[in-house]
Amino acid sequence: MNAMIVLLGGLAILVIGYVLYGGWLAKQWGVDPSRPTPAQEMHDGVDYVPTKPYILLGHHFSSIAGAGPINGPIQAAVFGWVPVLLWVLIGGIFFGAVHDFGALFASLRHKGQTIATVIAENIDDTAKKLFCIFAYLTLVLVVAAFASIVANTFAVNLANATEASNLANQRTAMISVLFIVVAIVYGLATRGREIPTAANITIAIAIIVVLVAVGYNFPLISLDYTTWMILLGVYIMVAAVAPVWILLQPRDFLSSFLLYGMIALSLIGIVGASITGDASNLQIPAFTDFYATNAAVDANGNAIIDPATGKAVMNKAAASGFLFPALFITIACGAISGFHSLVASGTTSKQLDNEKNARPIAYGGMLIECLLAIISLCAVGFVWTKYCAGGYASPTAVFAGGLSQMLACIPGLENIEGIAYTLLILAVSAFCLTSLDTATRLGRYMFQELWVPAGKSMDEATGARKVLTNPYVATLITVVLGVGLGMTGYTIIWPLFGAANQLLAALALLAVCAWLGNAGRNNKMFYIPMVFMLVVTLTSLVMTLQAKCTALMAGTGDPFAAGVQAVLAAVLFVLAVVLAVKGAKTIFGKKKAAAE
């Protein structure tokens, strides 16, 4: 494939999708720029804070991005570039962006409450409770995983660590800590001040350049994994209850320019290397097979055997399984991800200053992720042979390795590969941290909503419910569970996260579809995405259950891990069916009164 054609062609399609389909959705749903938003009507200076759209886009995009749009396409590249590109474009425009935009808009019309409240008011309270439990446990898993990932990225003296890897981790930790400290100062300094957009952006970019330079050249922090896990627990505890304007908004706003810079650097690398001829034809096959393995192979397609063990070498950056449903589970954030609905209806909806900005922030933010997914596909294509041979420890390493090598192909930039690789790794790590504290705040919201009495507000809770809906109590429980799981072995249940995340997406689509139907608005654009994602999720869960039960009966692998995964897969399957039936009765049955 020609990298530049794929990149620019994909970008053009995404822009057309935003203008035409995104604009059509806004008209169909009745987006009203004159209508006050929850941030204006319920302004409390903590969670509900009207925010300028370009600042809110920084928070929203930083929170939903993480490593997802990078990891998914690179892992799924084993199926070929055509299936990946088609799903990113079709899934992004007609599934993911609709999902994100719909979740944000529904939350706006439900006082900035989460998807759980949308379910309670448009399906029933039992469905809400089930969704809350499921979403909360998923968020705890996200907190555990991201805390562990960030701690591993910051820590020194890890197993098999080299002096170079320790130094890279110290630099990443130093820059990230500087970001947090400066973000607080920036939030305090700009609070209540009307700073022109151009000046604000210029200041933000200047701050980023200085922070990266200082952190890169003065990596003064040197802590081990356990210490970082404890410190991260303290940090997210504070971040989840602090007013959004003092840390969440400024830190994510500053961090977003790191991501924008990463995208710009990637575009320069791909276009530049394509023009020079070094990357005009990337080596990924258009299509490989309907079944893929993650066994490493050489340039001739032969399995690579480790001479020390006599076993096949595995490609740690690749997915495996049947194209359906593996492709649609693996490529999550690059096409559609349930986590986005929690962000859109959790933090973003409480900060939106005008309904007209819902489309650029939610629909547009998703399509920017699609662009990042296409960039990731180009990156893996440039290092395809090494990728297939299992030469990379992670998809993030593939991404940074491919793009830094592309940049080095441009005349005059031959010596930039090393620093470009470090900066790209840093950018990805920074967004794992933003996703971590956003997930903690979302976990707090979901835990609080779980204990709200049916038909009442949080303020009306009494007794034990009043204690459990307290933001500090909810946050403490979430942090203890998340960090505790991260330190004791979240990897046992992590293989189910992909299916759980896409089940969240299916249920969010179902909730918004039910609300629009009850409100008398066109909801038919949700039918195909909703049903498709349910089928994908249920198929994946059935295949997981079958595989784990087979392993248990055969006595192969870790029986404890297989047993836990089998039970959880069965529980998720039942949950999906129950909520799907309840949702279908609402959508196709008697309509309920709904928020306008």
Which role fits each region the language model picked out?
Residues 49-110, 121-125, 142, 147-158, ...:
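Membrane-interface helix-loop-helix modules in multi-pass membrane proteins
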Residues 2, 69-70, 82, 141-163, ...:
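Transmembrane helix-loop junctions in multi-pass membrane proteins
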Residues 125-140, 364-371, 416-420, 449-487:
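Loop-to-transmembrane helix boundary motifs in multi-pass membrane proteins
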Residues 10-20, 135, 139-144, 206-211, ...:
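Selective recognition of specific alpha-helical transmembrane segments in multi-pass small-molecule
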Residues 13-70, 256:
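Membrane-interface "cap" regions at the ends of multi-pass membrane proteins
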Residues 2-19, 76-107, 116, 171-179, ...:
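Extracellular loop-to-transmembrane helix junctions
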Residues 1-17, 204-255, 268-275, 299-300, ...:
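A generic transmembrane alpha-helix motif of multi-pass inner-membrane proteins
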